[in-house]
Amino acid sequence: MKKSTLALVVMGIVASASVQAAEIYNKDGNKLDVYGKVKAMHYMSDNASKDGDQSYIRFGFKGETQINDQLTGYGRWEAEFAGNKAESDTAQQKTRLAFAGLKYKDLGSFDYGRNLGALYDVEAWTDMFPEFGGDSSAQTDNFMTKRASGLATYRNTDFFGVIDGLNLTLQYQGKNENRDVKKQNGDGFGTSLTYDFGGSDFAISGAYTNSDRTNEQNLQSRGTGKRAEAWATGLKYDANNIYLATFYSETRKMTPITGGFANKTQNFEAVAQYQFDFGLRPSLGYVLSKGKDIEGIGDEDLVNYIDVGATYYFNKNMSAFVDYKINQLDSDNKLNINNDDIVAVGMTYQF
């Protein structure tokens, strides 16, 4: 049976969050696109801190300038604005991405700024739930696991034009010390490889990061050590309206917990989704992060939940969703991590 136009559009949206970018300028080798979304969302949970309005707006732009027939300059900025805060609240806006760089045809691109860490090249494959997910080892401003500051990033697609589907990332992160201790990092490097076997439906990926830790981090009561290290590997299948992905990762002296950092974590995520031609996309997933050798505790689950959800796409710009996070943490867990379930419901307009 032929895929419907709506199904094809939806799969494109899912593949790239900014696919709906609107071109507002394109002249003389200069191009500027804007994109964004309004997510009107409500959480329902026995955990008071997670119950209630969670609405927000995201807005960004991507620009390019053609320097010559080989060299292109580019930049990107993206911010998020809270929709559930009082107007007097100063903590309403945050910058998610802000970087600029140069791309030289088959040689690749190099940029600097606030960007996505190399480890997220693997973790992104399972970060696909309607609302939750992607939080076993990936955390914002946690070394190079997700969005982070001070990143110098080299990316090469199709391996210098020699191997179709083989993409390489090399990354360096400068130290960030003047912030909350769990958001700090020393100098570090990361790398990732993804390969889709020349455009096949299957893809594999792997990533590794290694960073200095700050002096303040080593004053914490848990997880002291000179280096923070992580590796991850993932698999993905994306064809015939089916999306399947999984990854496994380990971190050392990197994942924040009460009193400092986990000496080691073992992390697993999986997601399965099906895109119906009439717009419905059900989703089933699982997320687990197990802390190992924690001082005074031993081993303890840090994240453990089943996720059941669905998104309905009215068209390429409008969708509604529900996402049920079924928490599997023990009520008497030794780190006092909240174990309440959460149900998220909402609608999203994106362009």
Swiss-Prot record:
Instruction: Output the InterPro entries linked to this UniProt entry.
Output: Gram-neg_bact_OMP, Gram_neg_porin_domain, Porin_dom_sf, Porin_gammaproteobac, Porin_Gram-ve, Porin_Gram-ve_CS
Query: Which first-to-last residue range defines the signal peptide?
Result: 1-21
- Major site of localization recorded for this protein: membrane
**Classification via CDD domains:** gram_neg_porins
Q: Which Pfam families match?
A: Porin_1
Record has Iron as a keyword = no
One biological process term from GO is: monoatomic ion transmembrane transport
Cellular localisation:
Cell outer membrane
* One GO term describing the cellular component: cell outer membrane
Q: How does it sit in the membrane?
A: Multi-pass membrane protein
Q: What are the inducing conditions? A: By phosphate starvation.
Q: Which domain of life is it from?
A: Bacteria
Is Signal one of the keywords UniProt gives this record?
yes
Question: Which family does the record assign?
Answer: Belongs to the Gram-negative porin family.
Q: Quaternary arrangement and interactors, per the entry?
A: Homotrimer. Forms mixed heterotrimers with OmpC and with OmpF; other mixed heterotrimers are also probable.
What name has this protein been given in UniProt? Answer: Outer membrane porin PhoE
Species annotation? Escherichia coli (strain K12)
Name of encoding gene: phoE
